[in-house]
Amino acid sequence: MATAFKNYTAQSIGTTAYYVISQNSGAFNGGVSGLTSGKAVIMVGCMVSNRLTTSIAIDVVHYQNAGSKTTYLCKSLAIPAGDAIEIVQGKIVLMTADDISVVSNTASSADVVLSILFDA
């Protein structure tokens, strides 16, 4: 399979974790799939925006190997009203069954765009 850039998006994320790559709310659901053997995904960007007129706090979590390890990319990070923040300012390598979740402290408050290089 050829290398390709992909964007995963989600709108109005709230107080239930949203798994961006599996496009699933509430429970981990497989994460990255369909990779060519020996290949990976490189996350090159992750932008989270606040849809509301009040501040929100977000968590962005990397789930490695189908959720066996969890690492916070940010925890309780405040995003001012109507603002956005770039979570990834470098690159993060994702493997098969890895995923990224976003959750907010406020219902229907956050949008996310996750940009990846697939089959790198």
Where are these predicted regions, by residue range?
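Hydrophobic beta-strand residues in large extracellular and virion-surface proteins
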Residues: 48, 58-60, 79, 100-102
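Beta-strand elements of well-folded, non-transmembrane domains
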Residues: 50, 64, 116-118
